[in-house]
Amino acid sequence: MDPDGAGTLREGATGPEVTELQQRLLRIPDVYRDGATSGSYDPTLTAAVARFQLWYGIRGDETGVYGNDTRAALESRTAPVSG
């Protein structure tokens, strides 16, 4: 079990959940500029998550890790991603 909670994503993760994260971050100005929606949690995505956490004062997750606190903050600022 991940200490940051179920559904936590971090560098090295892949899949549709990562793609959704990438798509949501692209909607926040200047956080993930020109970022890929490849479904791969790479160093660029880690930096974008860390930037989002810093800019919005999210402290409940490790820096660059998409845990429960970061997920809640991002989802509250972006509409659901349509498949």
What are the residue ranges of the model-derived segments?
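Acidic, Ser/Thr/Pro/Gly-enriched interdomain connector segments
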Residues: M1-T44, V81
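Extracellular LysM carbohydrate-binding repeats and other cell-envelope/extracellular binding modules
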Residues: L45, A50-G83
